[in-house]
UniProtKB/Swiss-Prot annotation:
It comes from the Bacteria. It is found in: Cell membrane. NCBIfam families: PRK13825.1-2 (NF010398). The keyword Zinc does not apply. It is a multi-pass membrane protein. This is Conjugal transfer protein TraB. PROSITE patterns: CN_HYDROLASE. Enhances conjugal transfer of the Ti plasmid. The keyword Transferase does not apply. Residues 222-421 form the CN hydrolase domain.
Length: 421
């Protein structure tokens, strides 16, 4: 009898041990699968193809399915690092430096995204309310809080790869209602209703893809792309400006009233440059919008200027320059001065020839709050410029353009773009 009891005890212990091992194995596979899927979602959703942006809507689901805060952080890191994978190479190109400089900045930039999503993962809620953390409304509310933080400064300064950008693909023309529907969809993807939400969002996605058309140009507007590499904005010679003026005059036509040139096209904006361009446009019934830099004692402003035969003025001052490479706030804090100045919530919309436009320069096209800020003022068109010579070998410019297209489609606005590569 003692032998039988001992045998049964050993059998029970072995069965329990085998059960724990099986669970551990399943958990490891689940964690690995979640991280691999987050990497795939980041790669596909942010490939630079506008119609693939809704893939990013799967990220909240993967975050919500994470079994621990650590895994939620790993899932967030996999998504964000893959979505922003062009940054290390871009930084290396910009500074003509070692790839490791870009790698360190890439990892540092991901820290905010990972920290926010890991912090809002609802571990306590799951412990207090078994089953309801994943099935109720705790996770949706917490995810929306994380999404809002990543959409607005200060975390929103590096809030790239925001799934909300997919709104324009899912609900083109629906404006703020479409944005609200996408927000609700993101929340539902973290709840027990995620299969129904995924089916509904998938239906809108396929419908949009089947009826997709590119945004139109504003009447009488034209964007001119350039391929001048890193010389654009650095070559201030008379010949350079004359060549650009010739390019503008060649692009002008009977139906063209406004021509848009890329970011930094005019280099340093001075009275001499302004007079040169006014003289060059004499007799041409056209207005030029072009990127330039304006120096002041505190640093410089990255701007859009407008110039015609009869007028020149600064049209727009960039709200959010590229952090670290352009915007270096520590220089101001230490009294050194220098770097590009950020005008966060200034000039969200500007008027030109009776048309209100939403201007976006380069980095502003990668984050959420500048375009939403602009759309509060009901602009008639979006004007997006960039100087992407440093993105060679990456998909950064394609991602910028996909984001601009998505926002233009969401709000039903025409858009004109001009990029230098």
């Amino acid at each position: 009898m003692i032998h039988d009891t001992s045998a049964r005890s050993r059998t029970a212990v072995f069965s329990a041990w085998r059960g724990r091992c099986s669970r551990l194995t399943r958990d490891r596979w689940r964690v690995a699968l979640l991280i691999l899927l987050s990497i795939a979602v980041g790669a596909v959703g942010w490939s630079g193809e506008a119609l693939l942006l809704p893939t990013a809507m799967l990220f909240p689901l993967l975050w919500a399915q994470s079994p621990s805060r650590l895994v939620a952080g790993a899932v967030s890191a996999g998504y964000f690092l893959t979505a922003s994978r062009g940054l290390p190479q871009g930084v290396a190109n910009f500074y003509a430096a070692d790839f490791w400089h870009g790698l360190l900045l890439w990892l540092a930039a991901s820290a905010g995204f990972v920290a926010v999503h890991a912090a809002f993962w609802p571990a306590r809620l799951q412990k207090r309310l078994p089953g309801r953390g994943a099935l109720g409304w705790g996770k949706p509310v917490r995810y929306l809080a994380a999404a809002v933080l990543m959409g607005l400064p200060p975390f929103g300064i590096t809030g790239w790869a925001h799934p909300l950008t997919a709104a324009g693909i899912l609900f083109p023309g629906f404006g703020w209602w479409g944005l609200g529907a996408t927000t609700a969809g993101l929340a539902m993807m973290t709840s027990r209703y995620w299969p129904a939400a995924a089916i509904a969002l998938g239906g809108f996605w396929f419908w949009s893809a089947a009826t997709w058309t590119q945004p139109v140009l504003p009447d009488g507007w034209k964007g001119v792309d350039l391929e001048q590499g890193q010389t654009l904005g650095r070559d201030g010679s008379l010949d350079h400006h004359r060549d650009l003026i010739a390019t503008v005059r060649a692009a002008a036509g009977a139906e063209t009233r406004v021509i848009v040139l890329p970011e930094s096209a005019l280099g340093l904006w001075t009275p001499t440059v302004a007079r040169l361009w006014q003289a060059g446009l004499r007799g041409a019934d056209v207005t030029v919008i072009a990127g330039a830099a304006v120096i002041d004692p505190g640093g410089y402003d990255n701007v859009m200027v407008t110039v015609s035969e009869g007028e020149t003025r600064i049209l727009y001052r960039e709200r959010m320059p590229i952090p670290v490479s352009m915007w270096q706030p520590w220089l101001q804090w230490t009294g050194q001065g220098g770097g590009a100045q950020a005008h966060f919530f200034a000039n969200p919309a500007v008027d030109l020839a009776g048309t209100r436009i939403a201007p976006l320069i380069c980095y502003e096209q990668l984050i959420v709050w500048p375009i939403l800020h602009s759309m509060l003022f009901s602009p008639a068109a979006i004007v997006a410029t960039g100087n992407g010579w440093w993105t060679e070998g990456t998909s950064i410019v394609a991602i910028q353009q996909a984001g601009v297209i998505a926002w233009a489609k969401l709000f039903g606005r025409p858009v004109v773009t001009a990029f230098n590569t």
